[in-house]
Regions:
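Helix-loop boundary and gating motifs at the non-cytosolic
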Residues: 1-49, 205-244
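Cytoplasmic helix-loop-helix junction between adjacent transmembrane helices
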Residues: 99-138
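Juxtamembrane intracellular "pre-TM" segments in multi-pass secondary transporters
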Residues: 1-3, 180-211
């Protein structure tokens, strides 16, 4: 089982590294392919939709047909996505590529979290440790992506970067085929029925999502908030990738400790969540009032600490909702609820935050 844990985490690291690298050059690469800004923008929104909103189906399919099968399908769709993406001279191929990117990432990510719960057994400490490791490797890969991309952009070899990402996904897919068959032994297949939604999505489940959606949604808006701060306000766009690197580095440093220490109950979120919300919003306006490169980075530190706390708190709370059967559905439903909240908050940020 230790081998399977490492395999899942290694696959998550390299696949996310490739995914973030691809996203970083997404706009530039497709512009050079001759696609219009509106076509690129819509395809990117389709990617995010497939990646988030379909998570609940990814979870249900994982519970019904097997976590391993859905993760392998996700790996295969990632490979297929790069084939379409490299051939994306036509808009239809681009839409196929982004759909495969979003759904592939969704299938693997949702069911990998559920699989780690199954591997961990019944011990809460082991479950939270593995969920913390999953978040940590995700942060490490997002931190490494900007560093990987810089030389490819500088020397105008973006096409080579996409081919490198494609090669990573092909190698990962081939390496995963045999080991993933062992995962089936740790899971009991469950056929989903809509009548069971009430048993799974309890009042406490909905309550913690309602309480934590503000800090989590604002944290997801990192790629809007900090480019605005460093580019529009300070006129220093070169600091945006540095901020992303610092954010990833701090996340990696904090993640293990937070995973061990944070053990909130649903009732405790009633007073912790408002503190997190105020803590991530109020310093933003103080930063704008006392604007400088130093206050910007101070806010980045505050932002990251609250982001990691909120993400870890939610991950550990989901572990408590684990009923031993509908693990895929639990993570899928959580991802869907947070994606809907994030859409609402992100549409308000330009009017309330970016002033």
């Amino acid at each position: 089982m230790l081998y399977l844990q490492k395999l899942l985490l290694i696959r998550r690291f390299f696949s996310t590294l490739a995914f973030f690298s691809m996203q970083t050059v997404f706009f530039i690469y497709l512009q050079k392919k001759g696609l219009s800004n509106s076509e690129i923008a819509f395809s990117l929104s389709l990617l995010f939709f497939c990646n988030q909103a379909l998570a609940i189906f990814a979870g249900v399919w994982g519970d019904r047909f097997g976590l391993a099968k859905m993760m392998l399908l996700g790996c295969f769709l990632d490979v297929l996505a790069y084939i379409f993406f490299l051939s994306a001279d036509h808009y239809f191929l681009l839409l196929l590529a982004t759909t495969c990117f979003g759904l592939g990432s969704c299938l693997f990510g949702t069911n990998a979290k559920a699989c780690l719960l199954a591997i961990a057994g019944d011990e809460y400490a082991e479950k939270t440790r593995l969920q913390g490791k999953y978040l940590k490797v995700t942060s490490m890969s997002s931190m490494g992506a900007p560093l990987l991309v810089i030389p490819f952009i500088k020397y105008d070899h973006i096409n080579a970067l996409i081919w490198a990402c494609f090669a990573i996904e092909v190698i990962l897919f081939v390496l995963m085929i045999k080991p993933f068959s062992q995962i089936q032994a740790v899971q009991k297949l469950v056929k989903f029925r809509f009548s069971q939604i009430r048993d799974i999505m309890t009042k406490d489940f909905l309550f913690v999502h309602l309480m934590l959606f503000i800090p989590l949604s604002i944290a997801t808006s990192f790629f809007v908030i900090f480019p605005f701060l460093f580019d529009n306000k300070l006129g220093m766009p070169e600091h945006s990738p540095i901020a992303l690197f610092v954010n990833g580095l701090l996340t990696v440093l904090l993640q293990s400790t937070f995973s061990r220490k944070i053990n909130l109950t649903p009732k405790q979120t009633a007073w912790v969540a408002p503190i997190l919300a105020v803590g991530i919003v109020a310093p933003w306006f103080l930063t704008l009032h006392y604007l400088s490169i130093y206050t910007a980075y101070l806010y980045l530190v505050i932002f990251t600490v609250i982001e990691v706390y909120a993400l870890t708190a939610m991950a550990n709370l989901l572990v408590k909702f684990d009923n031993g059967t509908h693990r895929g559905f639990i993570f899928g439903a959580s991802r869907l609820l947070l994606s809907l909240a994030t859409v609402g908050v992100m549409n308000l940020i330009p009017h309330l935050f970016l002033v």
